[in-house]
Amino acid sequence: MRIQQVESFILHVPVTGKQIADSTHSISHWGVVGARITGEDGTVGYGFTGTHAHLPSDQLITRCIDTCLAPLLVGENALETERLWWRLARQPALQWVGRAGITTLAHAAVDVALWDLRAKALNMPLWQLLGGAVREEVRAYNTDIGWLSLSDDALLRGAQQAVDEGFTGIKIKVGSTVARDLQRLRAVRRAIGDTITLAIDGNGKWDLNDSLRFCQAAEASDVFWYEEPLWYDAVRAHAQLAHATRIPLALGEQLYSVDAFAEFIAQQAVHWLQPDVTRMAGITEVLRVIELAGAHRLPVAPHAGDMSQVHQHLNFSRTPCAVLEYIPWIRECFEEPIRVVDGHYQRPQQPGASTTPTPQAWERYRRATS
């Protein structure tokens, strides 16, 4: 099937609770910045990257899709996802400006759209195209209850509500002060008991010394993992922390290539890998990370930059993908939204990658691409 047209789009969707914050960001909307690819038979594939809904930077991504990537795709065989991935990745002018940032986010949207189109053309959900299901359901952990912007009371209420809804894992944000975050961590652990897994996420705010201080005191709270404890590409510092604490380290949402993950693994600086199809040039590159993880017997927990619309298919079809983040901000924007029952993702049934926006979302949240 030949590619007939490639178009970009932008949706800005409100987050839960109007405004949320972690240790480094405060946002009111999530950006769904993507590509719509039409095949010669009329089949349409959708893919997107996730942003903080900053229109000028979102328009840099759509401009890259429309002016740099689209000309390389029109007329090509849409089903040849691997070849087209390399065609875009090795385009000399794009390679010169860098294999990260804007060009890679644009590439991610296009790659996901191609996989969506391919699965639709074959009339099967993406997880089936990827080899079929390896599990009946996927364990979810709830992040939406744990923002730093929440009061202590709201944090505890949200944690208890998540447990009541069947979630067996939750994650809370840290990165304000060591003392305050230890207090919140201990309060949540007391509230939810010992049988619920409790992860923390620093979003890279603290330095090595603060992270070491925090971990020394936090180990008693049975922390499932400490996510992004340090600046995202500080491999040596992560290795030092990993060797100094019993808390497993998780990272990867800001890594752009399988090579970056390989370096963290080589330095024994990570225990949980968290690739994101919206940041890593799409599904094609994330599959390579999952293969790498499997070879090293490391678990994978994809980061929900796509709010898990796409990643759920990877969790269902790949053994290393053990758990999956739950943030419900954009779920109602899609024809087949993520579905979580008693704290577990249920298998998508419609053909494709679960990335087709509803007409209502298109009308309500669409923004200009230039």
What are these regions (language model features)?
Residues I3, G42, L69, V110, ...:
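Conserved, mostly hydrophobic/aromatic
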Residues Q5, T38-A121:
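Metal- or metallocofactor-binding catalytic centers and their adjacent structured scaffolds
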Residues Q128-T245:
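Metal-dependent enolase-superfamily TIM-barrel catalytic cores that perform enediolate-based chemistry
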Residues Q216, D222, D233-H344, P348, ...:
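Shared catalytic-loop signature of beta/alpha-barrel
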